[in-house]
């Protein structure tokens, strides 16, 4: 993603997604990086065959911008064929999703 990056790390417990903004730590850069991740995430999860519990650690954004991130993620996942449910935000500002597993993930092949 432009002006940032994100990492997808499958663990035994869940899939962790960490979004970073590189050197720009402004809220605007955080929102931009999070929205770019939201558009790309369904494709990346599908390519890797990842599902189950997914926890996103977004780049820092104000609470008022959380709805914009949720809308972007929901729009992106609506276009995807794998069922994905939004669980909600944790007290620590992480976003939880639940995604159906429709095939073995690429790490287990």
Q: Across the structure, where does each feature detected by a protein language model lie?
A:
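Conserved glycine-centered short motifs in functionally critical loops
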Residues: 2-109
């Amino acid at each position: 993603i432009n002006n940032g990056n994100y990492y997808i790390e499958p663990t035994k417990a869940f899939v962790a997604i960490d979004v970073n903004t590189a050197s720009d730590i402004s809220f605007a850069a955080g929102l931009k990086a999070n929205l770019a991740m939201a558009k790309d995430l369904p494709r990346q999860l599908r390519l890797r065959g990842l599902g189950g519990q997914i926890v996103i650690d977004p780049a820092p954004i104000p609470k008022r911008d959380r709805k914009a991130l949720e809308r972007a993620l929901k729009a992106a996942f609506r276009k995807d064929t794998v069922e994905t449910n939004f669980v909600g935000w944790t007290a620590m500002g992480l976003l939880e999703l639940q995604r159906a597993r429709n095939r073995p993930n690429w790490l287990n092949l």
